[in-house]
């Protein structure tokens, strides 16, 4: 990493500050919509809230934001960047060589982050639309919760529907809108506190600890389940590191934290002033003058949409990284925007839409959704803490210090997990079931890949160079293709899958001028695009290792075109002049890609568990993108060949020949 790149990454700018507001803080910035409301409703309503309860609640929120968001994520996790990229899978790639079992927290953390992301749009948009209940002239319409649900679903349909076209055209307004949003949170919160400046006593952590053990707190430690709603966006903050740079987050987070803390304090001050008024509206909207509420609802809806968009885009990125790390099935990925960071995965988009819509229909109110929200993200944070401990050790932190620091955060997050566990019975089970389903799919995919590596046999290409040369020169066989390309997941030195050589020499000898053996390796660096070539001392056999970052598309033909030109220009590969062509001077022949698919056969030596893994993986493959589409081969000539998983060590089934018995009287 050059000093100039490091400086640019750590450097802050005015434009970067605004961009960070629009990309990074959508989730955590919309938490004031529902956090205080959740606390009040679980306490029994505004009239049941005492001053000590309010002071303790605000103190818990302030210190939760300080410990988890500021110290763990902003000050520690942001330093764990993988070539400027953040997030749990980027962190995993930094430490995966330290222990093979680290794949487990990475998969669990990724799955729970995905499942939590499916709930966020439902909670934020519903909370914003429910604000219309406090708007004079519209309240009589939106007192009917069905109208809230219909409006929310319309917004979600539009939001998920435009994903296929890319969101760059509206992304430019995200930053300015969120700047207005945070400014409003800060200003309105500050003015609400002017009549109750005692609310700032909540900065003292005494009030937080006192509330946890106070009889006035009807929920005891389980109140932390509502408190945690204030910091659910901390993980997203780390995941979006690569989009805005560390420096811009360092500069923007103090502003964001100040604004949301003022909002929480302002809502608390309004509750103290109106606890006997009988008003049972969301304190966030009720604390604003009635003539401004319609504008606030509009602004809150925009902020909720921006937060939802960030979660949707983050889900696409998360799944894309998991696919390239070979722990998730391959789904079709498109790039509707001008840059690689704007990607779209249709299957994931519509699964998220289905889950989000079902959440709105099943839970109906934001209060019911809040009762289920946050459980999964506590697990994600615990998994991130585990990986961070290994990262600190890798970077030279004394092991005892790394253990102590991360043990502290693990303890805090485990307490939040226990406090949120009660949400399981109030709808949290839906998020847990979704997370378990994602973990199951990841486990099957990862385990299936390991089984294939275990059983597939390899042969040395050098031992077959002469046979392949003879086949190339044998005019008794028709030319199969000028260039035949085999894609192999397993290629080390000159060792290659036996099934590939079987395809060339045995299955139907494939005569070609050049045989290409291509292996795609995903690197820990996100945007690597490099290759290494070995001609094996010939001009007809080419081994290509493609080294692509885990955020790069694996469109092999595009890379191969460049490699062919490089080899011909350097004289390592003869030009393939074409007699018949519409392109004058064309000196590259035609290509055919051969894909070999391994399938489980009933006569193979797999254990029952391994057979279950492979059969389940095969079933999942039916709904995933084909390798042809994944490697960008849909416009190329492709042959798909099916081979049994184990090409050797075939079990010999006992069978005897029936010998005719001669008639003794003959």
UniProtKB/Swiss-Prot annotation:
Q: Does the keyword Cell membrane apply?
A: yes
Compartment annotation: Cell membrane
Q: Does the keyword Ion transport apply?
A: yes
The annotated topology with respect to the bilayer is: Multi-pass membrane protein
Q: Which reaction does it catalyse?
A: K(+)(in) + H(+)(in) = K(+)(out) + H(+)(out)
UniProt keyword annotations, A-Z: Cell membrane, Ion transport, Membrane, Potassium, Potassium transport, Symport, Transmembrane, Transmembrane helix, Transport
Query: What InterPro entries does this protein map onto?
Result: K+_transporter, K_trans_C, K_trans_N, Kup
User: Which molecular-function annotations from GO does this UniProt entry contain?
Assistant: potassium ion transmembrane transporter activity; symporter activity
The source's domain of life comes to: Bacteria
Do you know which Pfam families this protein is assigned to?
K_trans (PF02705), K_trans_C (PF22776)
* Entry GO CC: plasma membrane
Q: Where are the transmembrane segments?
A: 16-36, 58-78, 100-120, 141-161, 165-185, 221-241, 253-273, 294-314, 343-363, 373-393, 399-419, 424-444
Main localisation, per the record?
A: membrane
Which family, according to UniProt? Belongs to the HAK/KUP transporter (TC 2.A.72) family.
Q: What does this protein do?
A: Transport of potassium into the cell. Likely operates as a K(+):H(+) symporter.
Q: What is this protein called?
A: Probable potassium transport system protein Kup
Q: Give the organism the record lists.
A: Streptococcus pyogenes serotype M1
- Name the gene that codes for it: kup
């Amino acid at each position: 990493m050059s000093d100039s790149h490091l400086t640019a990454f750590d450097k802050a700018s005015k434009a970067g500050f605004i961009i960070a507001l629009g990309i990074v803080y959508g989730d955590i910035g919309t938490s004031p919509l529902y956090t205080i409301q959740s606390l009040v409703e679980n306490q029994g309503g505004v009239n049941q809230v005492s001053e000590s309860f309010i002071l303790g609640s605000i103190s818990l929120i302030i210190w939760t934001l300080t410990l988890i968001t500021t110290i763990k994520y902003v000050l520690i996790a942001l330093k764990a960047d993988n070539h400027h990229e953040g997030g749990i899978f980027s962190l995993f790639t930094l430490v995966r060589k330290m222990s093979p079992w680290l794949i487990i927290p990475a998969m669990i953390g990724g799955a729970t982050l995905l499942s939590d992301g499916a709930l966020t749009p439902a909670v934020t948009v519903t909370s914003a639309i429910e604000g219309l209940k406090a708007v004079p002239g519209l309240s009589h319409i939106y007192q009917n919760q069905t109208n809230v649900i219909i409006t929310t679903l319309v917004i979600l349909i539009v939001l998920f529907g435009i994903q296929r076209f890319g969101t760059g055209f509206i992304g430019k307004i995200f930053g300015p809108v969120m700047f207005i949003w945070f400014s409003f949170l800060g200003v309105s919160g500050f003015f609400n506190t002017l009549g109750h400046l005692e609310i700032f006593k909540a900065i003292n952590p005494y009030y937080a600890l006192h509330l946890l053990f106070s009889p006035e707190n009807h929920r005891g430690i389980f109140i932390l389940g509502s408190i945690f709603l204030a910091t659910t966006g901390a993980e997203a903050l780390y995941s979006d590191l690569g989009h805005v740079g560390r420096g811009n987050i360092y500069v923007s987070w103090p502003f964001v934290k100040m604004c949301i803390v003022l909002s929480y304090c302002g809502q608390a001050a309004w509750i103290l002033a109106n606890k006997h008024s009988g008003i049972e509206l969301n304190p966030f909207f009720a604390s604003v003058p009635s003539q401004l509420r319609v504008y606030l609802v509009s602004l809150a809806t925009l902020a909720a949409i921006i937060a939802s968009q960030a979660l949707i885009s983050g889900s696409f990125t998360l799944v894309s990284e998991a696919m390239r790390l070979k722990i998730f099935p391959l789904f079709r990925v498109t790039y509707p925007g001008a840059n690689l960071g704007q990607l779209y995965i249709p299957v994931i988009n519509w699964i998220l839409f289905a889950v989000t819509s079902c959440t709105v229909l099943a839970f109906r109110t934001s209060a019911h959704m809040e009762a289920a929200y946050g459980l999964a993200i506590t697990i994600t944070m615990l998994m991130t803490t585990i990986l961070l401990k290994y990262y600190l050790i890798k970077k030279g932190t004394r092991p005892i210090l790394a253990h102590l620091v991360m043990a502290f955060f693990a303890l805090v997050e485990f307490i939040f997990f226990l406090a949120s566990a009660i949400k399981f019975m109030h709808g949290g089970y839906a998020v847990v079931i979704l997370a378990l389903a994602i973990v199951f799919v990841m486990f099957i995919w990862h385990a299936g890949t390991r089984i294939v590596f275990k059983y597939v046999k390899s042969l040395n290409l050098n031992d077959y160079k002469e046979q392949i040369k003879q086949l190339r020169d044998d005019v008794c066989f028709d030319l199969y293709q000028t260039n035949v390309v085999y894609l192999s997941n397993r290629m080390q030195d000159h060792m290659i899958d036996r099934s590939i050589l079987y395809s060339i020499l045995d299955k139907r000898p494939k005569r070609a001028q050049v045989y290409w053996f291509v292996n795609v390796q995903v690197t820990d660096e996100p945007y690597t695009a490099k290759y290494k070539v070995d001609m094996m001392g010939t001009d007809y056999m080419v081994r290509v290792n493609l080294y692509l970052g885990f955020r790069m598309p694996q469109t092999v033909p595009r890379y191969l075109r460049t490699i062919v030109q490089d080899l011909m220009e350097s004289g390592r590969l003869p030009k393939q002049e074409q007699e018949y062509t519409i392109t004058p001077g064309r000196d590259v022949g035609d290509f055919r890609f051969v894909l070999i698919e391994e399938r489980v056969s009933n006569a193979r030596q797999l254990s029952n568990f391994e057979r279950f893994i492979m059969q389940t993986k095969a079933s999942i493959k039916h709904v995933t993108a084909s390798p042809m589409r994944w490697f960008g081969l849909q416009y190329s000539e492709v042959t798909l060949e099916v081979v049994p998983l184990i090409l050797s060590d075939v079990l010999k089934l006992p069978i005897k020949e029936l010998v005719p018995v001669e008639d003794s009287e003959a």
